[in-house]
Each structure stands twice: as structure tokens, then as C-alpha cells.
Regions:
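Short boundary/hinge segments that flank catalytic cores
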Residues: 2-117, 121-140, 151, 173, ...
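Residue-level preference for the first positions of well-ordered beta-strands
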Residues: 86-88, 117, 163-165, 197-199
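Conserved dinucleotide-binding and phosphotransfer motif residues
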Residues: 112-113, 194, 217
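Nucleotide-state-sensitive switch-loop elements of NTP-binding domains
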Residues: 143-171
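Phosphate-binding/switch loop-helix module in NTP-utilizing enzymes
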Residues: 168-208
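Well-ordered beta-strand positions
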Residues: 197, 220-223, 251
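Inter-motif core of Ras-like GTPase G domains
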Residues: 207-228
Length: 290
């Protein structure tokens, strides 16, 4: 009989220990337990081959992006001028999906009839060209030029009426110094007059200082955390940035979640709106909390 109970408990023990040792972020609850940063929404793992949201898409990824578009307006409650709303997107490390989300947040806003500019400002490691077709010239070429107009480097996305892109351009030898130039300030001053929204794909904050250099241009910062990739302990980085106010008006987006975990009506409402849909688990999963 003892051997029977040992055999019965052994698999549960293995599962429990495995769960105990797994420190990766899984759900919204993991983010909220480890940070005090407002939670804007989560984006389920995409099952579509399309890299950019389409107007008729009804996938869980597309719906989550529409909810994030709605929730974004709460971040602009204190904005008093009529200039473009500037949304900066960053993460702790590369490969957390910030470029994917930058492009799709810009596309989702453009589908609502707003004039949107996407800027590639991760000039050390540009990735926009992996998702959409853009020229090799762009922001850095403009910043190093003396007689070029910014309009020469901005392109319109063919399948959108109001979606424009300023690519990163060639990788410069001195990215930090380039981003510190007054020409960047003048550029944003000009662009804010011509668009409704500006979405900026910036560098990961865990690696370089580039994002902090341009942070003053942002109305809000979306901090992307990728589920099953980032360690919970790494959340101390955005938490410190939030409390030290190094990135203005921060909110977290949890990317690449399992669609059965936390996705449902109102799942993305990080400001107390809607009802969280909880996944129903078997008794043994509830017992061991995995």
C-alpha cells in the first residue's frame, strides 16, 4: 500500500517541483504580483501567418490589440495640447516582441481613421524591416544629413490610408551621440504637428541607454514583457524605472500569452474595467498551483 501511495505522489511531486523552479512570467497575475506598474493588456500568441493586423481580423490577437488601443486613451487623460500623442515602446531585452507590437499598435490606431507615424528608433538593431517592406534609409540618414527634408525618408504603407513609417536607417557608429543631437528635438517638434499619433519602437532598456536619451519626447511608455521568456526577477528593472520616473507614464503589455490563460471578456482592462475570466483548472492543478 505504501508503494502505491509513493507511486501516486511521485508524479505530483515532480510536477510541483518543476513548477516551483519555473520562474518565467506566465500570466497577468505574475506581472501584478511583482510590479506596481499599470497593466494595459495582454496579447495572446498569434496563430495567424499575417504579421500585421487587418481591418477584418477577428483573431484573439487582433481583438487584444483593439482593447489596448482603447485602454491607451486612459494614459492620455492629462494631455492638454493638440499635438500628436507619442507612444514609445520598449522592453528589457531583445526578442520580447516590442517591434511586433509597435507595428501592430500603430496599424490598429490607423485603422480607426487616425493619421499615424511609426518611427524605428532602435537604431542599433532595427527590426521593422522583418515585418514590413521599408527602404534601408531612414531616421539616421536624416539626422546625419545637412540638406535633406524628413519627408524624403517617410513612406506610406500601401494597404492603409493613414499609416506612415520612418525606418531606422543605416546603423550609425555613434548611436547615443546621434540621438542626443538637437536635431532629434526639432524633428519631434515638427512631426507632432503633422500626425495624430506617433508610435516609436525604441531600444531595450536592459542593454543600452538610447531609450533614456529620447524618453522626454514620449507621452507614454509601453513596456513589453514576453510570457514564458522573461524571468520574474527581471521585473525589478521596469519597477525601478517606474518608481524613479525615468520613463514617463509607463504601462505594461504582456506579450505572447497562451490564449487559454487570462484571455476573455475584459481581460485587458488594466484600470479596473471589465471582468477577468479565470481559466478553470482540474483539482490537481489548483492544488499545486500550476
Amino acid at each position: 500500500l505504501g508503494a502505491f501511495f509513493v507511486g501516486l505522489l511521485l508524479p505530483f511531486s515532480v510536477i510541483y517541483i518543476k513548477n516551483l523552479l519555473d520562474t518565467k512570467i506566465k500570466t497577468r497575475l505574475d506581472v501584478e504580483k511583482n510590479t506596481s506598474i499599470p497593466f494595459l493588456g495582454d496579447v495572446p500568441k498569434s496563430t495567424s501567418s499575417n504579421q500585421i493586423i487587418e481591418i477584418n481580423s477577428r483573431s484573439s490577437t487582433a481583438e487584444s490589440l483593439r482593447i489596448i488601443r482603447t485602454n491607451l486613451e486612459f494614459l492620455f487623460n492629462n494631455k492638454t495640447n493638440d499635438l500628436a500623442k507619442t507612444i514609445f515602446v520598449t522592453s528589457t531585452f531583445p526578442k520580447e516582441g516590442k517591434t511586433f507590437l509597435s507595428i501592430n499598435i500603430a496599424a490598429t490606431i490607423a485603422l480607426s481613421g487616425k493619421k499615424v507615424l511609426l518611427i524605428g528608433m532602435d537604431v542599433r538593431n532595427p527590426k521593422i524591416d522583418e515585418y514590413i517592406k521599408v527602404p534601408s534609409t531612414g531616421l539616421t540618414n536624416y539626422l546625419t544629413s545637412t540638406n535633406k527634408d524628413i519627408s524624403e525618408f517617410i513612406i506610406k504603407q500601401d494597404t492603409f490610408d493613414q499609416f506612415y513609417v520612418l525606418p531606422s536607417g543605416v546603423i550609425p557608429p555613434n548611436p547615443a551621440e546621434l540621438l542626443m543631437s538637437k536635431k532629434v528635438d526639432d524633428l519631434f517638434e515638427e512631426l507632432k504637428k503633422n500626425y495624430d499619433y506617433i508610435v516609436v519602437d525604441t531600444a531595450p532598456v536592459g542593454l543600452v541607454t538610447d531609450t533614456f536619451i529620447v524618453a522626454k519626447q514620449a507621452d507614454c511608455f509601453l513596456y513589453v514583457v514576453r510570457a514564458n521568456v522573461l524571468d520574474k526577477r527581471m521585473l525589478r528593472i521596469p519597477e525601478e524605472l517606474y518608481h524613479e520616473k525615468k520613463l514617463p507614464n509607463m504601462a505594461v503589455i504582456l506579450n505572447d500569452t497562451e490564449s487559454t490563460k487570462g484571455y476573455g471578456y475584459g481581460y485587458g482592462y488594466g484600470y479596473g474595467y471589465g471582468v477577468e475570466v479565470e481559466e478553470k483548472k482540474p483539482w490537481y492543478r489548483r492544488l499545486f498551483n500550476f
